[in-house]
Curated annotation (Swiss-Prot):
Pfam families: Anticodon_2 (PF19269), tRNA-synt_1c (PF00749)
SUPFAM superfamilies on file: An anticodon-binding domain of class I aminoacyl-tRNA synthetases, Nucleotidylyl transferase
Motif interval(s): 'KMSKS' region: 240-244
Catalytic reaction(s) noted: tRNA(Glu) + L-glutamate + ATP = L-glutamyl-tRNA(Glu) + AMP + diphosphate
Motif 'HIGH' region per record, residues: 11-21
Name used for this protein in its record: Glutamate--tRNA ligase 2
Enzyme class: ligase
One example GO MF annotation: ATP binding
Gene3D superfamilies assigned to the protein according to its UniProt record, in alphabetical order: 1.10.10.350, HUPs
Keywords on record: Aminoacyl-tRNA synthetase, ATP-binding, Cytoplasm, Ligase, Nucleotide-binding, Protein biosynthesis
Cited CDD domains: GluRS_core
Entry EC no(s): 6.1.1.17
Species name: Rickettsia rickettsii (strain Sheila Smith)
Amino acid sequence: MNNNVITRFAPSPTGFLHIGSARTALFNYLFARHHNGKFLLRIEDTDKERSTKEAVEAIFSGLKWLGLDWNGEVIFQSKRNNLYKEAALKLLQNGKAYYCFTRQEEIERQRQQALENKQHFIFNSEWRDKDPSIYPTDIKPVIRLKTPREGSITIHDTLQGEVVIENSHIDDMVLLRADGTATYMLAVVVDDHDMGITHIIRGNDHLTNAARQLAIYQAFGYAVPSMTHIPLIHGADGAKLSKRHGALGIEAYKDMGYLPESLCNYLLRLGWSHGDDEIISMTQAIDWFNLDSLGKSPAKLDFAKMNSLNSHYLRMLDNDSLTSKIVEILEQNYNKLLQKLAYREEFGGNTERSTAAYIDIREDASTGLTYKLPLAVELPKKFKVSEQEIGYIKQAMPSLLVRSETLLELTRLAQIYLVDSPIIYSQDSKEIIENCDKNLIKQIIENLSELEQFDKESVQNKFKEIAAANDLKLNDIMKPVRALITGMTASPSVFEIAEILGKENILKRLKII
């Protein structure tokens, strides 16, 4: 074990914590922990226009939810510009950089000319070797790196092998802008050196940047960290991952009902392997992780595998833990809706306006759990799942798990057991209820009312009797009954639901018709 290993995760806070970025963070975390080293976090927020506090918080919360705890204080590049400026001036003094006074308009003119001539554009500044005595005083210069004209740069990548790039293909990149702020290239190199980074593990979309950064390393005389550029994640169709494939933020996967343990396991296997092992705990991942087992081909995002893994991790949780998670989601989302519905009171009891507000809120539901509160009821100040309902959910858990791969699916089914809240009817179940034989439902209510024993066997036998008496198949009468009791067209066994909820609750739901 090498406890001198220091890795870093360095996202730009311009959006959510992307699933590909989360995998990069995971690999850096595991490599550092495997070697008893340090995993550092750096926020690359030099782009003031695009960086947001919300994105920073999304990065923090996403990493914490995944269990990827970092060492030490978070480094913010926006607070380190003086360090970058000093570094640029040092290169200037050592003849490794120069002031460039070429206006941006002239650079763009040259770029356009090269494009028209179908030539690769590399800007060659006329100021590279000019004497400071002729520097203009009316133009604020940038500081550019004096990249060697001859020779080449070799990236020694642990995964990609040796990548050689001719120096003639590398421009004299800007290190310090005219306003005194550092560019990304300078800041990254200075930070990695200052933070003592020993290993850089990142996506291979940074491979081109690596050559330019190596030129800066050489100019400073810094030791170059070990570099590993991993293939990007692709969609199931092999195309570059995009939103249509599921390139969502980690927060979205959390809201979709994935467990952090299962998502980490899935991301780990997305480009890394340990024999035929599919289920890998975080402890095992730390013990086993190495760079030699990384794949060279792009991994494909596969929701079927993700769901299968998540289903496994759901079943590893005990009943109390699962129920607690379900109750938390139910209460959070019910209370979100109550907050939105609360403003309805401003309409002074105007039913038409109230109805309109209610419809808007239904369409605005963003959690995947849509709730329905009749306009006639008085809104509670706060929703809370009762102890009785918690007991129902715990009792039903085995049958709920069989039909669920995510916490969200579990929670949707668990709503069946909220006896103090109105049933939510799917569109299909509404159609079944509207078209069912109302007299048959009344007959079912009468027969179930007479039952003294209300266990699932007794309830099932009673339904068989009713079906036979009406010359119907059991399934024919269970469709409307299921719709009325659950609001769904597919659910756990109605007979089991009946036993758990009891006669009073079942009759109450059947009588809605």
